[in-house]
Amino acid sequence: MNASVFSAAFLLLSLASSAVYAALSDEVSDPPDVPKLNTQPWVPARYKAVRENLLGKECGILFVGDSITECWEREGAALWKRLFVPMKAVNFGVSGDRTDSMLWRMEDTELAVRTSPRYCILLAGTNNIGLWKGRQPAEQTVKGIREIAVRLLKRFPETRLILMEVTPYGPDPDSPLRRRQEEINRLLRRLELPRTTILSINGSLLKPDGTFREGMFKDHVHLTEKGYLAWADALLPLLNGEG
């Protein structure tokens, strides 16, 4: 291949690579309120477990969410066993789930518990922020969260919903993804839904300057046992009828 042909081929390859990169950078997020299966490789085993734990079971409290909810069974396991198992709590959290994936699981299972829960606790939106690197507008993420909430309230007409504000995304209060998370929470606080309490634990997780309190997080989003204790402390007055 002579130099001119090689240069032309290299130019074409560079242009093609640039086009692919631009397409990935401009990728549009999936509709947050349209059910879609989470296809990440660890999901089938986890979904099988939560499905078996849900269908036909007594349910006093239903936790719906992503890995932060799932990890009640790991970092929060001692608290879960002591505080929530006696309340017949069911963990319907799957790591990596966005709002669309939670909706898919709700449709697939029909949330067919044997007894309707007294409370549903919903924490959603973290992976809508993370997967799309902040490209999904806050209004769209809230649209997905609201759709989950509406379906839960419709499915369980006597149940009360505790809608959690999204927990902090990253230790830097000035980062774009943290600002997106806070924007989502501002919009969540404006929602008007029946039988719903909107609850934030972020004041317990953050210092006054917005950075992480020591010992609350094991990484940029996931809680330690101490973080789960803060969540439990906020939930228990509501679950026990004191709030």
List each language-model region with its residue ranges.
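N-terminal secretory targeting modules
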Residues: M1-V64, I68-K81, T115, E242-G243
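Acidic/histidine-rich helix-loop elements
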Residues: P32-N38, N91-R98, G130-P137, H220
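Structural recognition of the beta-strand scaffold that forms the well-ordered cores
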Residues: G60-G65, K88-G93, R118-A124, N128-G130, ...
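Oxyanion-hole/transition-state-stabilizing segment in secreted/luminal serine hydrolases
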Residues: E70-V85, T99-K143, R151, I162, ...
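Generic structural signal for well-ordered alpha-helices
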Residues: I145-V150, N185
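A non-catalytic structural micro-motif
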Residues: F156-L163, R195
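Catalytic His-Asp segment of secreted/periplasmic serine-dependent ester chemistry enzymes
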Residues: P168-G243
